[in-house]
Amino acid sequence: MPELAVQKVVVHPLVLLSVVDHFNRIGKVGNQKRVVGVLLGSWQKKVLDVSNSFAVPFDEDDKDDSVWFLDHDYLENMYGMFKKVNARERIVGWYHTGPKLHKNDIAINELMKRYCPNSVLVIIDVKPKDLGLPTEAYISVEEVHDDGTPTSKTFEHVTSEIGAEEAEEVGVEHLLRDIKDTTVGTLSQRITNQVHGLKGLNSKLLDIRSYLEKVATGKLPINHQIIYQLQDVFNLLPDVSLQEFVKAFYLKTNDQMVVVYLASLIRSVVALHNLINNKIANRDAEKKEGQEKEESKKDRKEDKEKDKDKEKSDVKKEEKKEKK
C-alpha cells in the first residue's frame, strides 16, 4: 500500500450494517461497552474506500485501560479467507463502536500497523443521539510539543463520508422503504430534522466550550491549529449589536410574520367559503327532498281518486244490470 496521507475516508453501508450486527450480537450479550473489528478496502490516491469489514474477538479491563486483548491469530485467519474471495480488499484499518476515543486506542492502532502501515481508525456510533454521520475517522500522527519534550502519538481527525455503489443504494432504498412511516407528513419531518440539527449544534458548542475550559485550566495543551479554526468560526459570526443587522433582522421577521398573517387570513376565507357552500348544498338537498315528498303525496292522492272513480263506475254498471 502506498505511503500516502489520508484526506478522506468513504465508508460503505455494508460496513455500517456489519458493525451494527456485530454490536447487537456481541455487545449486548456480553455486556461489552464497545466491539472491535477490522476494515477492508482499497486506496484511490488519497481517498480511502472502506467496502467491507469483519469482527475480531476483543476484550478489555474496565478499570485498567492498559489491559486489553485482541485475537490477532483469528484476525490473520479471517483475512486469509477474505483474501481468497476478493484479493483487491486489503486491511486498511480498524473500527470500534466508541462512541468516543479511548486511552488504549493508540496501543491498539500500533498493533494494527503490523498489517497496515497507514492504519485508519473509524469510530462508528451504533446509537447516534443527534442527526448527522455516525462515523468519525482518525489517523495516528506524531505530535511535536512546544516545550521541547519528546514527541508523542496522537490521533488526527480525517474527513469521512458515506458512499455506496449502485447495488448498495438499491438495497438501502429498499430497507428505508420498509421502515419509513408514511403517516408522518413532510412538514413534521422537516421540523424534526431542524430540531435534531439544533441539538447537534448545541452538543458541538458544548464540546468546544469544554475544550476551551480544559485548555484555560491547563488540563490540555494548546493546539494552535484548533485555536485558529475556532477564531475563524468566531470571525464569521454576525455582529448582533450592529444597528444595520438589527434593522435587517426586524424587517425580515416582519415580512415573515406578514406572510404568516396573510396565509392565516386566506385559510380563514377558504374555510368560510367552504362552510357557505356546504350550507347552500344542504339547503338545496333539503328543498329537493321536500319537493320529492310533495310530488309523491300528490301521486298517491291522484291514485286514490282514480280508484274511487273506478269503484263508482263499477257500482253504476251493476245497478244498470239489476234494473234490466
From Swiss-Prot:
Keywords: Acetylation, Isopeptide bond, Proteasome, Ubl conjugation. Transmembrane segments: none annotated. Residues 9-144 form the MPN domain. GO terms for cellular component: cytosol; extracellular exosome; extracellular region; ficolin-1-rich granule lumen; membrane; nucleoplasm; nucleus; proteasome complex. There is a cross-link at K180 (Glycyl lysine isopeptide (Lys-Gly) (interchain with G-Cter in ubiquitin)). InterPro entries: EIF3F/CSN6-like_C, JAMM/MPN+_dom, MPN, MPN_RPN7_8. The modification N6-acetyllysine is found at K204, K214, K316, K317. Residues 281-324 are annotated as: Disordered. The keyword 4Fe-4S does not apply. GO terms for biological process: proteasome-mediated ubiquitin-dependent protein catabolic process. One of its GO terms (molecular function) is protein homodimerization activity. Belongs to the peptidase M67A family. Does not bind a metal ion. Component of the 26S proteasome, a multiprotein complex involved in the ATP-dependent degradation of ubiquitinated proteins. This complex plays a key role in the maintenance of protein homeostasis by removing misfolded or damaged proteins, which could impair cellular functions, and by removing proteins whose functions are no longer required. Therefore, the proteasome participates in numerous cellular processes, including cell cycle progression, apoptosis, or DNA damage repair. Component of the 19S proteasome regulatory particle complex. The 26S proteasome consists of a 20S core particle (CP) and two 19S regulatory subunits (RP). The regulatory particle is made of a lid composed of 9 subunits including PSMD7, a base containing 6 ATPases and few additional components. Within the complex, PSMD7 interacts with subunit PSMD4 through their respective MPN domain. Interacts with TRIM5. This is 26S proteasome non-ATPase regulatory subunit 7. It comes from Homo sapiens. The lineage of its organism: Eukaryota, Metazoa, Chordata, Craniata, Vertebrata. The gene is PSMD7.
